[in-house]
């Protein structure tokens, strides 16, 4: 039987996952710190993180379901905040953006796994923050892509190349792809939307594979803990995504970069 303290810890981790998964601040860095503080580590903790990531992914599907169906040619009227779309953003754009990270991820899987340690994550947090600042400084004054349907195949592929940086734990997948999009001439809001949509197949594939490998760690007694974490991550991620998209219309990514430096300092203080 799962005790209340375990469920409370599951809810806390669900909140952390939901808040940080799609913000350019690195969910990995936060989960390492909070998991350490709660004493929740090991194989079961890793399996739990996979489960709650699926909750975050579901939140993206709920927010962008019209766009996701539109990728395969099924349209349900106007997309909120965009109006009528011309359907130029297709599944082929997403597949092209996925290829670099999928290829490198399969080739260097063991190397990437070895990077899941506090010191490596700390460095990734700092360098990812520098990239966010660089993107804000060097982005074109006049964006070439103002909406998702303006994104070219070249831009999609280059964003996918930047996504390879996120194979380094702590770098932040959204931070890498959004920065890459901005440097390629995609405006901040659209780069964020593309990053979220790209996250669905990427994270579902990675999480699905990790879950399959971790099935032997699951037991019926863990269902309440997993359920609480999953639902909490879903609800919090839903709010976080909508709030983030509204916020970045008014502010730059500099505050997120500064926050990353603070988290890196926290990792150093806790683990070094």
UniProtKB/Swiss-Prot annotation:
The gene is uppP. It comes from the Bacteria. It comes from Photorhabdus laumondii subsp. laumondii (strain DSM 15139 / CIP 105565 / TT01). Its main location: membrane. It catalyses: di-trans,octa-cis-undecaprenyl diphosphate + H2O = di-trans,octa-cis-undecaprenyl phosphate + phosphate + H(+). One of its GO terms (biological process) is response to antibiotic. The keyword NADP does not apply. GO terms for cellular component: plasma membrane. It is a multi-pass membrane protein. Coiled coil: none annotated. The keyword Transmembrane applies. The lineage of its organism: Bacteria, Pseudomonadati, Pseudomonadota, Gammaproteobacteria, Enterobacterales. GO terms for molecular function: undecaprenyl-diphosphatase activity. It is found in: Cell inner membrane. Catalyzes the dephosphorylation of undecaprenyl diphosphate (UPP). Confers resistance to bacitracin. Belongs to the UppP family. This is Undecaprenyl-diphosphatase. The chain crosses the membrane at residues 22-42, 45-65, 92-112, 118-138, 189-209, 228-248, 251-271. Keywords: Antibiotic resistance, Cell inner membrane, Cell membrane, Cell shape, Cell wall biogenesis/degradation, Hydrolase, Membrane, Peptidoglycan synthesis, Transmembrane, Transmembrane helix. Bacitracin is thought to be involved in the inhibition of peptidoglycan synthesis by sequestering undecaprenyl diphosphate, thereby reducing the pool of lipid carrier available.
């Amino acid at each position: 039987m799962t005790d209340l303290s375990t469920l409370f810890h599951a809810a806390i981790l669900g909140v952390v996952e939901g808040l940080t998964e799609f913000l350019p601040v690195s969910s990995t860095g936060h989960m390492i710190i909070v998991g350490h503080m709660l004493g929740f580590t090991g194989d079961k903790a890793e399996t739990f993180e996979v489960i709650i990531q699926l909750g975050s992914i579901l939140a993206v599907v709920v927010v962008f379901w019209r766009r996701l169906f539109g990728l395969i040619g099924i349209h349900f009227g106007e997309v909120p905040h965009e109006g009528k779309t011309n359907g130029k953003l297709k599944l082929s754009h997403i597949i092209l953006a996925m290829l670099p990270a999928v290829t490198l991820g399969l080739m260097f899987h063991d190397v990437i796994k070895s990077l899941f340690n506090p010191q490596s994550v700390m460095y990734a947090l700092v360098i990812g923050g520098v990239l966010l600042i660089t993107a804000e400084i060097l982005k074109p004054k006049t964006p070439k892509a103002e909406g998702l349907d303006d994104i070219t195949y070249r831009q999609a592929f280059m964003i996918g190349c930047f996504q390879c940086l996120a194979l380094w734990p702590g770098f932040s997948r959204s931070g890498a792809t959004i920065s890459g999009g901005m440097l390629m001439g995609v405006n901040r809001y659209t780069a964020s939307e593309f990053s979220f949509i790209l996250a669905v197949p990427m994270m579902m594939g990675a999480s699905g594979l990790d879950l399959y490998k971790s099935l032997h760690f699951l037991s019926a007694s863990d269902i309440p803990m997993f359920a609480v974490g999953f639902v909490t991550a879903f609800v919090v991620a839903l709010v976080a995504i909508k709030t983030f998209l509204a916020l970045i219309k008014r502010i730059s990514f500099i505050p997120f970069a500064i926050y990353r430096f603070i988290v890196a300092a926290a990792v150093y203080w806790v683990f070094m």
